[in-house]
Amino acid sequence: MNTFSQVWVFSDTPSRLPELMNGAQALANQINTFVLNDADGAQAIQLGANHVWKLNGKPDDRMIEDYAGVMADTIRQHGADGLVLLPNTRRGKLLAAKLGYRLKVAVSNDASTVSVQDGKATVKHMVYGGLAIGEERIATPYAVLTISSGTFDAAQPDASRTGETHTVEWQAPAVAITRTATQARQSNSVDLDKARLVVSVGRGIGSKENIALAEQLCKAIGAELACSRPVAENEKWMEHERYVGISNLMLKPELYLAVGISGQIQHMVGANASQTIFAINKDKNAPIFQYADYGIVGDAVKILPALIAALAR
């Protein structure tokens, strides 16, 4: 048996739902999708859900993951085995842990490939900080998986599809976190997962002010701007949402232009699926050149203006 009888899907991030739904179609015969509102339910049906389960009644001061109890009860009531697919977001991983505990089944995070062999899920994901790929065969009847971005292609909506809609009512857990305040933060409005062309900067760009050169290059070629983890986490030059690497974005663009990035493995696992990698680095021995299809050895601050000028001609 190379598919499960059913799969359960939930995404706290709407943009990740089409990808998870496509994976669900490949892995199971029946797709159940938990949603938070009617609009998401309609989208889920168009993406292939046979049954939509609307989570309803959560107080505003409670967290989404507090639905774990009623979600686990619903899953348990409708089948003895199957898959649960969640995005590998922070909330997705927290919910996965809660579901795994309540269902008493195995949880595997950051899956990069998923298959079914003899009725059991087989999962591959990065281990040892991206230095190797580990394979796990899940022995429990259910497997709760968080899926890395880009593992599956996005499902295409079909307005002619139909499905059944159900309601799952809120039940307060015995122990829970209560939200006392919410503070908005500036977040990345660009969906880098879908970008065809990406210019990514590392600390080799020299300063936050020099990132303007990379932005000009992006404008010249129609690319989106990304960065390495040190640029976002250590230097605070760019938003967290834009850094590429094993613990964040895993990209597959047509072109990945790395500017001042050394090319450590933890970064490259997020970029080495790119069709073409172009590197600019002043260190001729930088690891990035082992991955690059094309490279320029030199100071990015001098090379970028020349490159932008050449593109303008």
Swiss-Prot record:
Q: Which InterPro entries match?
A: DHS-like_NAD/FAD-binding_dom, ETF_a/b_N, ETF_a/FixB, ETF_asu_C, ETF_asu_C_CS, FixB, Rossmann-like_a/b/a_fold
Keyword Zinc in annotation:
no
> Which Pfam families does the record associate with it?
ETF, ETF_alpha
Binding residues for FAD: 255-283
Q: What does the record give as its pathway?
A: Amine and polyamine metabolism; carnitine metabolism
**GO MF annotation terms:** electron transfer activity; flavin adenine dinucleotide binding
The keyword Transcription is assigned to this record: no
* Record key words, sorted: Electron transport, FAD, Flavoprotein, Transport
Q: What biological-process GO terms show up in the record?
A: carnitine metabolic process; fatty acid beta-oxidation using acyl-CoA dehydrogenase
Q: Assembly state and interactors?
A: Heterodimer of FixA and FixB.
The record's section on PANTHER family has: ELECTRON TRANSFER FLAVOPROTEIN ALPHA (PTHR43153), PROTEIN FIXB-RELATED (PTHR43153:SF5)
Q: What does this protein do?
A: Required for anaerobic carnitine reduction. May bring reductant to CaiA.
Spell out the family assignment given in the record's similarity comment.
Answer: Belongs to the ETF alpha-subunit/FixB family.
Would you tell me the protein name for this molecule?
Protein FixB
Organism, by scientific name, is Escherichia coli O139:H28 (strain E24377A / ETEC)
